[in-house]
């Protein structure tokens, strides 16, 4: 059977919070089959476990924020994206603040941590959410949509009227049957505009933001000396975010995702719309790994390879 996966050993790192600017300790621990991805605020007087789920997402203005009993963990999307890309079903994430450290602004550090810990198959079937009917959410000209598809495919379009973004491409389509998440998506960094960063700092946000963890643009150009990691890094990062946003549903999706100018809020609304219609999806497993869509029958170290 196609099995669930966790990590083999505990792994730790330290990083800076994007919004707080504080040093944050992050620990990833193996979890039993059926656990899911569980974030734990170990800095609180009484630690609070917050399982990743579509219904636990609260604030989505600047990131995907998990909330439970007054506790919150912000900026979970990059780590969730890495878990999706490496096929991790079960994991404990211990964190000493209310946000996941931003690291380099991509999912690459989290991929490295998980691969360093080692990936272990577990004696339980991997459960997929198979979309059986189209589901769509719109907000003005923005939309996000899921269609039935035997695999995992994404098409994302952005619309940033900026010379540097225009030159790199505003649309990307990826089918993970023939695309490596680790090589083609994981290293794409978050991006922002210098004038917006100043406004956020005045509001007490983005205190940890810098060119070490984001692509920063002025009105005309990219300010980072090292330029871009991918020719189309902007739209690839939006896709990286979407993969993480969708993975909070609790299982990998078998679906085609299409989006125009979507963000954390619309992605979460799409998941809630899907879950609200029980006839739009079913839970499936694969007794024969070779019967699973290409890209999911991966080896022990890579997914979507």
From Swiss-Prot:
The active site is at residue 264. It comes from the Bacteria. Pfam families: LpxC. Its cofactor is Zn(2+). Pathway: Glycolipid biosynthesis; lipid IV(A) biosynthesis; lipid IV(A) from (3R)-3-hydroxytetradecanoyl-[acyl-carrier-protein] and UDP-N-acetyl-alpha-D-glucosamine: step 2/6. One of its GO terms (cellular component) is membrane. It is an enzyme of class 3 (hydrolase). Zn(2+) binds at residues 78, 237, 241. Keywords: Hydrolase, Lipid A biosynthesis, Lipid biosynthesis, Lipid metabolism, Metal-binding, Zinc. It catalyses: a UDP-3-O-[(3R)-3-hydroxyacyl]-N-acetyl-alpha-D-glucosamine + H2O = a UDP-3-O-[(3R)-3-hydroxyacyl]-alpha-D-glucosamine + acetate. One of its GO terms (molecular function) is UDP-3-O-acyl-N-acetylglucosamine deacetylase activity. Its EC number is 3.5.1.108. GO terms for biological process: lipid A biosynthetic process. InterPro entries: Ribosomal_Su5_D2-typ_SF, UDP-acyl_GlcNac_deAcase, UDP-acyl_GlcNac_deAcase_C, UDP-acyl_N-AcGlcN_deAcase_N. Belongs to the LpxC family. Catalyzes the hydrolysis of UDP-3-O-myristoyl-N-acetylglucosamine to form UDP-3-O-myristoylglucosamine and acetate, the committed step in lipid A biosynthesis. NCBIfam families: lpxC. This is UDP-3-O-acyl-N-acetylglucosamine deacetylase.
């Amino acid at each position: 059977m196609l099995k669930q996966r966790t990590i083999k050993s505990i792994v730790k790192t330290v990083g800076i919070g994007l919004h707080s600017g504080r040093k944050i300790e992050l620990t990833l621990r193996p979890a039993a089959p059926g656990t899911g991805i569980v974030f734990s605020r170990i800095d609180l007087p009484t630690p609070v476990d917050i399982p990743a789920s579509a219904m636990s997402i609260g604030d989505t203005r600047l990131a995907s924020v998990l909330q439970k009993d007054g506790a919150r963990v912000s900026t979970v999307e990059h780590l969730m994206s890495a878990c999706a890309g490496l096929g991790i079903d079960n994991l404990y994430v211990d964190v000493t603040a209310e946000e996941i450290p931003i690291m380099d602004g991509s999912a690459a550090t989290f991929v490295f941590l998980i691969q360093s810990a080692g990936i272990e198959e577990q004696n339980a079937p991997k459960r997929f959410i198979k979309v059986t009917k189209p589901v769509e959410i719109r907000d003005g000209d923005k939309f996000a949509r899921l269609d039935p598809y035997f695999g995992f495919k994404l098409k994302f379009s952005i619309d940033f009227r900026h010379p540097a973004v225009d030159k790199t491409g505003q649309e990307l389509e990826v089918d993970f049957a023939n695309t490596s998440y680790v090589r083609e998506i994981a290293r794409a960094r978050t991006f922002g505009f210098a004038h917006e960063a100043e406004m956020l700092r005045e509001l007490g946000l983005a205190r940890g933001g810098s060119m070490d963890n984001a692509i920063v643009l002025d009105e005309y150009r990219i300010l980072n000396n090292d330029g871009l990691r991918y020719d189309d890094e902007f739209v690839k990062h939006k896709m990286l975010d979407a993969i993480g946003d969708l993975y909070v549903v609790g299982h990998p999706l078998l679906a085609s995702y299409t989006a125009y100018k979507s963000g954390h809020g619309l992605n979460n609304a799409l998941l809630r719309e899907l879950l609200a219609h029980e006839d739009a999806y079913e839970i499936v497993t694969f007794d024969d790994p070779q019967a699973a869509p290409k890209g999911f029958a991966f080896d022990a170290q890579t997914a979507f390879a």
